[in-house]
Amino acid sequence: MDKESITNAEENSYDKPNNNIRPQGFDDFLGQNNIKSKLKVFINSAKKREVSLDHILFYGPPGLGKTTLAQIIANEMGSNIKATSAPIIERPGDLASILTTLGEKDILFIDEIHRLRTVVEEVLYSAMEDFFVDIKVGEGTSAKSFRVKLPHFTLIGATTRSGLLSTPLYDRFGIVERLEFYTNEDLANIVKRSSEFLNINITDEAAISIASRSRGTPRIVNRLLRRVFDFATVHDVLKIDEKFACDSLEKLGIDKNGFEALDKLYLNTIIKHYNGGPVGVDTLSVSLSEQIETIEDVIEPYLIQCGFIKRTPKGRVATNKAYGYLNLSSKYDDNYSNEERGLFDF
């Protein structure tokens, strides 16, 4: 999948940094109400006892607010935050140098934490549990190791693939929360909030239309809002209504479900090339010329959430909803025509 795809929930060049849009506190963070209510309790408890917050793991599809929540937690705790990404931390010494710069109750945020190398991850064990690191100096027989005490800090890890975390690392997180896709109502409220900061005049109906095509993801809803605003600016439209929003999104190649060409190709491949499934992700990766990680983390989560495909032990299976979306009769239906059956003859 093109990383610059407008409905790719991973961060890309469409996402212009805007500190005004990014929520700074829980009151500004719309959605994920269950998680927010629990985090408020944990934070208030830690502040009342004057201790650092337990280590936190956020997991779920990209673009749902894991990084933003980490920043909000730092703000609520009155703590400094150091943000990094697992692929950047190549050696144990890289991690040790980061840890030794932290202050008491500071927060270390590691994105894509499932991608930590094992030798780096092992440094975290003692750091998270006992707040020390052993630093090795020198090489060979002359090498020496000395122990450095660390302040009581909070590690916040974020991942789209919690299943890839090792058990020793996973078990050291005291708080583990899964972020879910957002409702259209929450996304429409995000559109209206962002519109105020960006000075965009938009109707409630247009906000709902943009929200419904945003794949349950705040990052995408803000991205689509900006692109619709681009069309409005070029065409001298002073107020974005529902029709203008829908027309603009259609021009961007995004249908009412929030699907792009690759989503349709994915469904067509399963149904027309593999008889609706089951088909393995390795095979799909070859057929689509996409990495397995992209299929599993970017394409499939929303299709599964919407009920278009199922993951089974034998592979991916298209549902009746997928057949209907492509205007095909399901192979399990009595109305399945001979012509359509021919699509699956090899």
Curated annotation (Swiss-Prot):
Task: Return the annotated region ranges for Small ATPAse domain (RuvB-S).
Answer: 183-253
In residue numbers, the region (Disordered) covers 1-23
| Annotated DNA binding sites | R311, R316
Transmembrane domains' residue ranges: none
Q: What is this protein called?
A: Holliday junction branch migration complex subunit RuvB
Q: Spell out the subunit comment.
A: Homohexamer. Forms an RuvA(8)-RuvB(12)-Holliday junction (HJ) complex. HJ DNA is sandwiched between 2 RuvA tetramers; dsDNA enters through RuvA and exits via RuvB. An RuvB hexamer assembles on each DNA strand where it exits the tetramer. Each RuvB hexamer is contacted by two RuvA subunits (via domain III) on 2 adjacent RuvB subunits; this complex drives branch migration. In the full resolvosome a probable DNA-RuvA(4)-RuvB(12)-RuvC(2) complex forms which resolves the HJ.
The alphabetized UniProt keywords are: ATP-binding, Cytoplasm, DNA damage, DNA recombination, DNA repair, DNA-binding, Hydrolase, Nucleotide-binding
- Region Head domain (RuvB-H): what ranges? 256-346
Q: Which InterPro entries match?
A: AAA+_ATPase, AAA_lid_4, DNA_helicase_Holl-junc_RuvB, P-loop_NTPase, RuvB-like_N, RuvB_C, WH-like_DNA-bd_sf, WH_DNA-bd_sf
